[in-house]
């Protein structure tokens, strides 16, 4: 019933030794992983997004939460407060007057925080790009993790962007050492 130590005698290749030990323990009903992997797995399955809807893209954003697309089945739930959310979705035309409010809301979010820029206006100013009062992309105010193109992007495109964010979180890891 004991675990053999052959995995520990595999030499300097720790990854190979870990894989051997993991294969042996799986047959006995155990899982070998790291704390960082568990935290990232939990983080991707419980994203709480906050809307920062500024224009017509916000209507498409609402469709993502409705029964047809149901983002909650992927562990992505809406929240009203920035202090309870991990993800901010910026949708619509960001004006110079609204930019400080966007930054203030972003600063109120707990770490780690992510931003999705939704639509042509949020990505780069869109139709109003040459207007004197429009910020040419919300990435000039806050760091953006995922860009969702379109005018307005469909609910499927936003859902795909949210799933890509989950994939990015799993791939990169966010624990500071």
Curated annotation (Swiss-Prot):
Free-text cofactor note: Binds 1 [4Fe-4S] cluster.
Membrane topology recorded in Swiss-Prot or TrEMBL: Peripheral membrane protein
Needed co-factor(s): [4Fe-4S] cluster
GO molecular function, one term: NADH:ubiquinone reductase (non-electrogenic) activity
Subunit structure: NDH-1 is composed of 14 different subunits. Subunits NuoB, C, D, E, F, and G constitute the peripheral sector of the complex.
Organism: Dinoroseobacter shibae (strain DSM 16493 / NCIMB 14021 / DFL 12)
Similarity annotation: Belongs to the complex I 20 kDa subunit family.
Name of the gene this protein is made from: nuoB
Database matches in PANTHER family: NADH DEHYDROGENASE, NADH DEHYDROGENASE [UBIQUINONE] IRON-SULFUR PROTEIN 7, MITOCHONDRIAL
Protein name: NADH-quinone oxidoreductase subunit B
Broad class of where this protein is predominantly found: membrane
Biological role stated in the UniProt entry: NDH-1 shuttles electrons from NADH, via FMN and iron-sulfur (Fe-S) centers, to quinones in the respiratory chain. Couples the redox reaction to proton translocation (for every two electrons transferred, four hydrogen ions are translocated across the cytoplasmic membrane), and thus conserves the redox energy in a proton gradient.
Documented EC number(s): 7.1.1.-
Catalytic activities: a quinone + NADH + 5 H(+)(in) = a quinol + NAD(+) + 4 H(+)(out)
Binding locations of [4Fe-4S] cluster: 56-57, 121, 151
Any single GO BP term: electron transport coupled proton transport
Keywords: 4Fe-4S, Cell inner membrane, Cell membrane, Iron, Iron-sulfur, Membrane, Metal-binding, NAD, Quinone, Translocase, Transport, Ubiquinone
InterPro entries from the UniProt entry: NADH_UbQ_OxRdtase-like_20kDa (IPR006137), NADH_UQ_OxRdtase_20Kd_su (IPR006138)
């Amino acid at each position: 019933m004991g675990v053999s130590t052959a995995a520990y005698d595999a030499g300097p290749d720790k990854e190979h030794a870990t894989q051997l030990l993991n294969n042996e323990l799986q047959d006995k009903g155990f899982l070998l992983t790291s704390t960082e992997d568990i935290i990232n797995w939990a983080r991707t399955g419980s994203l709480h997004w906050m809307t920062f809807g500024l224009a017509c893209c916000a209507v498409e954003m609402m469709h993502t939460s409705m029964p047809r697309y149901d983002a909650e089945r992927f562990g992505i739930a809406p929240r009203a407060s920035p202090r309870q959310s991990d993800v901010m979705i910026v949708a619509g035309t960001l004006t110079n007057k609204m930019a400080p409010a966007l930054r203030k809301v972003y600063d109120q979010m707990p770490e780690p925080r992510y931003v999705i820029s939704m639509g042509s206006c949020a990505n780069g100013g869109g139709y109003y790009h040459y207007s004197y009062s429009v910020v040419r992309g919300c990435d000039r105010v806050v760091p953006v993790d995922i860009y969702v193109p379109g005018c307005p992007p469909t609910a499927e495109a936003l859902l795909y962007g949210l799933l890509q964010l989950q994939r990015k979180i799993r791939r990169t890891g966010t624990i500071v050492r």
